[in-house]
């Protein structure tokens, strides 16, 4: 696991129109988040905070138990989740893209499935409220409909009745 450092900084890159995380002299993480999506605090306080570090490590440790991703992927997922949690403005719910979950088993995990008309894919819940959840796309590309798609780690808010707890069965079949 890449250990969080007080030297890490969030960078608002106008050239790429993206939020970057400067990890050291040789390494930067380029997120899919555009500058217009960022909170004002991103521009005022660019340092990776203790709160950022704690959340990053919590997500990493949670995801490692699934045994689906290598350490580099775990870092990338965890850092993008941290960016969404602390650096992004609130996103509006876009539940109409997803099928409603009609099963009786509630989701108890933060790694979930969402199903659009075009496909089904894995997402990570970054923030959860009683009505809706902010999720990041874990697939390389997720097709919402014929015209729109989400790139990897792009955030979307969905009503909780769209959350499918199918990954538990999927994970156990991959591990077995």
UniProtKB/Swiss-Prot annotation:
Pfam families: ZapC_C (PF07126), ZapC_N (PF21083). Signal peptide: none annotated. InterPro entries: ZapC, ZapC_C, ZapC_N. Coiled coil: none annotated. One of its GO terms (biological process) is FtsZ-dependent cytokinesis. The keyword Glycosyltransferase does not apply. Its main location: cytoplasm. It comes from the Bacteria. Keywords: Cell cycle, Cell division, Cytoplasm, Septation. It is found in: Cytoplasm. Belongs to the ZapC family. HAMAP family: ZapC. Interacts directly with FtsZ. Contributes to the efficiency of the cell division process by stabilizing the polymeric form of the cell division protein FtsZ. Acts by promoting interactions between FtsZ protofilaments and suppressing the GTPase activity of FtsZ. This is Cell division protein ZapC. It comes from Pseudoalteromonas translucida (strain TAC 125).
